[in-house]
């Protein structure tokens, strides 16, 4: 078996490695693919909310900032098998047409993740790869008879798919360093989470991440309030740094900007141009006579319900001019001292103290992993043990939401497969 390659893990990186290795060797039987599940690519079925965001079409210069913690490590693998190469591979070799959507995200045209997983598995079988499903590899020692080994076991996210961190143990067995691993692209739970928020979808808003009260990152786009907290979209992009900060005992705050396209001054001007929106009809006459009109009238206080105008003279329904109706009540509860004067600032700055996060059982991605210092970026080979290779999420390499993580899997998997096969020749 010294002329045979073992690949542990049948996810996107492992299948890509198997395909490339079989092509180089010209004999799929010299490639043995082990997977503990009864079907390959199980995690692919969950990606992109079941639609499978294959990659992102941004140029390397725009793509690279979305890779963590060392974008330079990926550069050679990306150049060797780029996002455009991935698209051509699926369309021309696997017969899976693709579509590019908002944010340069690429999906199968069917928007069915299973089409991607099945196409990869079909190609693996066509090449004659020896696929051993339902087989758990417990240690590297079990693979001692193989001439080369690729570890493509994934991380620890979504353990129900078989990603239980086995690859870290294999790496340590070979003398490799494994950096701290933690959940990324996961839900962030605020303190005193308002029960009216779960289920709301936020569109075109801003989120600002503060660690120990210092602004460290900002994003603009969409996210969801769920039962678990702030989730999906731009919340996921902030979660990597937020989780790491919580992991290290730091204070984490996220500030929501409901009107990122407008400055506070522009919001103030809007109010001044249409003061009638902010007072109930019965109080407009008195309000006009106030020397502080129109920017000093409370809109809500601790003793009134959101729909109660008896104390304020202002109809909270007017907030619908600035907020979706379903968000009005939670916004007012979060701002019991709201006035027309401070309304612009509150619309631009709704703070959430983050106290917890969902773990690996819900995280989309694992951050951390096998130290990149011990991997050759041009081959994915171990610097410590000849014939040993790593690819995919098991590495200390991850990306933002938007197709970046699957591109990492495909690029590093392709390079590892080619390199390991050449090692055997």
Locate each region found by the language model.
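Glycine-rich FAD pyrophosphate-binding loop
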Residues: 6, 22-49
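An anion/pyrophosphate-binding glycine-rich loop and adjacent beta-alpha core
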Residues: 38-40, 45-46, 60, 177-180, ...
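A conserved short coil-to-beta-strand element within the FAD-binding core of flavoproteins
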Residues: 133-143
């Amino acid at each position: 078996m010294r002329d045979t390659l073992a690949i542990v893990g049948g996810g996107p990186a492992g299948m890509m490695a198997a395909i490339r290795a079989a092509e180089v060797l010209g004999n799929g039987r010299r490639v043995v693919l082990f997977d503990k599940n009864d079907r390959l690519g199980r995690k692919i079925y969950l990606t992109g909310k079941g639609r499978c965001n294959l990659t992102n079409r941004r140029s390397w210069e725009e793509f690279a900032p979305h890779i963590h913690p060392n974008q330079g490590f990926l550069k050679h693998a990306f150049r060797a098998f780029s996002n455009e190469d991935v698209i051509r591979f699926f369309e021309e070799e696997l017969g899976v047409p693709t579509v590019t959507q908002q944010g340069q995200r690429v999906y199968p045209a069917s928007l069915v993740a299973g089409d991607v997983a099945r196409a990869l598995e079909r190609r693996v079988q066509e090449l004659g790869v020896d696929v051993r499903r339902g087989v758990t590899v417990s240690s590297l020692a079990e693979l001692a008879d193989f001439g080369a080994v690729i570890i493509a076991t994934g991380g620890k996210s979504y353990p129900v798919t078989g990603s239980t961190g086995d690859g870290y143990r294999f790496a340590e067995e070979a003398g490799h360093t494994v950096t701290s691993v933690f959940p990324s692209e996961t839900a962030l739970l605020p303190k005193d989470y308002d029960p009216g928020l779960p289920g709301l979808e936020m569109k075109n808003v801003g989120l600002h991440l503060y660690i120990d009260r210092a602004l460290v990152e900002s994003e603009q786009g969409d996210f969801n309030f769920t039962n678990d907290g702030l989730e999906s979209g731009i919340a996921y992009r902030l979660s990597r740094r937020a989780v790491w900060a919580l992991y290290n005992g730091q204070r984490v705050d996220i500030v929501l900007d409901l009107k990122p396209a407008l400055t506070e001054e522009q919001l103030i001007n809007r109010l001044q141009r249409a003061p009638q929106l902010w007072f109930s009809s019965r109080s407009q006459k008195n309000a006009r006579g106030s020397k502080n009109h129109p920017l000093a009238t409370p809109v809500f206080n601790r003793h009134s319900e959101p729909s109660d105008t008896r104390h304020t003279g202002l109809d909270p329904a007017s907030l619908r001019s600035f907020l979706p109706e379903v968000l009005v009540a939670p916004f007012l509860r979060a701002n019991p001292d709201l006035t027309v004067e401070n309304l612009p600032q509150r619309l631009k700055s709704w703070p959430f103290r983050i106290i917890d996060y969902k773990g690996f059982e819900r995280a989309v991605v694992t951050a951390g992993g096998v130290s990149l210092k011990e991997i050759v970026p041009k081959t994915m080979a171990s610097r410590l043990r000849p014939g040993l290779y790593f690819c995919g999420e098991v590495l200390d390499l991850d990306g933002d939401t938007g197709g970046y993580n699957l591109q990492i899997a495909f690029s590093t998997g392709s390079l590892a497969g080619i390199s390991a096969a050449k090692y055997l020749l």
